Amino acid sequence: MAAVKKRKTAGRKGAGAKTTTAASAHADEVARRNAAQDDVVVAQIRDAATEVHRDILKKAKPDLAFPVRSLKNVTYSANRGYFEMGRAKKVRTLTVNTVKSFAQTLRMMGLSKELVETNDFATKRDAYYQSKNWEAAKFDEQTESDAVMDDIEAMFSTRGTSREQLRFIPDEHGGAVAGRLVVLDPDRDTGVVERIDCTRFGSGAYSIPSTVEHLSFETDAKFVLAIETGGIFQRLQSHKFWQTANCILVSLAGVPTRATRRFIRKLSDECNLPVYAFVDCDPYGISNIYRTLKVGSGNAAHLSQFFCVPQARYLGVTPQDIIDYQLPTHPLLDVDIKRGKDALKNDPFFQVHKPWRKAIEQLLSMGVRAEQQALAKWGLNYVIDEYLPAKLRNPQAFLP
């Protein structure tokens, strides 16, 4: 989905104001594309069900094939810049022993088709409770329905369809957003587009919704700054760092949710914006938070084409920053050391990038970790006045 052309937004309307004619026309185009995508999704579900029906008529055992979701079945594509699922499959064949799980899978696919056709959605929890009307096919625990939904998502991802397009949405919302961005959000019933100005939330911020496919953007920002901790995000927001740096701030709140990752990806793709990550300097911040944002994860590599942000670069905090800025540190815990060694030994992303191998090896040899807030040693606003401006003068030096 294309964004409204990147342009100056001086004099734009505040949150809640009605859209311009141009924005309304763009929203109509987005709606048309979404409707066309819905038709594709329904056709894909029908095709999968038709194959099962055809096998039954031939008196053959029908089966459904799903990608194996693990790091062992993942490769890193340097060309695309994200994890890709390998060829390993698990097959669910209809037998006496699998009849319940097979039926549950088909019922979940049927629920997805109904949601698409009625322009509705369901969370994982909703889907679990919906199954209570499925008689013998009902789920006893939500973990069972979650696993079936994840398998269906992985299966349809090979056809270019995401879980959100299947109309299953996360239970959690995304992170917070502040700065030089107007979000165009069409009402699902009336089509009237609301212009949400992310500079006008006072000391607060815009909250990313659970699904973001219908959104489009206007911005004149130069980059997106993705921030791990709420404390640093709040400091940058309250001092309007986005104004002086001409940027958009996004709070990751730890490992970013699907909605947050998709929002950043759409924003980067549609507005041609670089994304800089600012997280704690520890193996968790590097190999869980940043790596998941940039290339995805082993268990969810089937999502990477939709949710990762290949354009992301790592601003800091780096192991070298700990030395250069004489930051207060904490000793690495055993779990940190294990996570760092696992990244070097088993993670395809870090194995491909020599600068990252060097940085992780440096961190392990130092035996310490440092938080973003450690910069407050030099003053509460040192991160705003000195650290970030110095870093942003040389983005070419950021880790890949």
What do these predicted regions represent?
Residues 280:
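Active-site glycine-centered loops adjacent to acidic/histidine catalytic or metal-binding residues
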Residues 2-274, 283-400:
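Nucleic-acid enzyme cleavage-core boundary/entry regions
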